[in-house]
Each structure stands twice: as structure tokens, then as C-alpha cells.
């Protein structure tokens, strides 16, 4: 399994829907990746609400909070991590992108994405191709798709190293 420094991070930029935050927390916990939240959030983010939003996954998730984008950028830069923005405006499809160990997948605010300055500071941007005429996916659905592609391309799913590629886990019903 990849060392913690080389596992991807999932990052949410100023999320404003608590249910999406909870889903991202669960996604991060189940896939054993850190969830970084760039504040301010559009909802109070205290211990009681964290527990409620993340159900029983809050304790298993590696949640890291950043006061603002500058603080987040400093943390990612300390570990020499590339920021990969998930954007409807990107030209590169997420499934044709060359992910690297330690990439940070950054999802924008549900209502507005990220400011141009944040987008410009990212090392890459990817999009999920959609049916013509439709705008976007739910932010956590998009993040899950991109994170899955990133992890699959590097053999980073929990158990991959022990199991090899012979067989995978089946979805629980």
C-alpha cells in the first residue's frame, strides 16, 4: 500500500451543503484518504454537526480543516502535492488523465465552483464528460468518480497490495 504521503487527498473548497460534506467524509473514510476542507463552509462545522454529518464515519476519516485557501495551499505545498481541480470547464477528461502519487483532487463549491485565482493555482484540471445539455454532477459523485479513477490507476484501493488484481470486492447490498 502507498505510504500516507503518496496517497491522494480529497479536498472540498468552501462546501455549502452539509449533506455533501457528510457524503465526502464517508467516501474519504471508506477509501482511506484524507479529506481536506477549505473554510469557510456555508454551514457551521462543529463537533456535534461533524458527528451527525459523517454518521459513524467521522472517527475513521482523516479530516483536516484549513482556515482558507492560502493555508490549504501551504499544507499541500509542504508535501509537494499537485492540485488537480475537478471542473466542468476543464478540457482533459478525468479518465484520460495521468494521475500521480500524492495528487490532491480539489472539488469546488456546489454553488459556484472555485474563483479564477484558485483555478489558476492548480497544476491540472479534469472534467467528467456529460450528456450534451446537462450542466454537472453532484460534487461528491464527481469527486468519487475521479478519486476512484486516480486510485485504480495506481493500485491504491484498500486491499489491492495484498490481493493483487485477481479479484475484487463485491458491492454490499
What are the language-model segments listed below?
Residues 1-173:
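Post-transcriptional modification and biogenesis factors for structured RNAs
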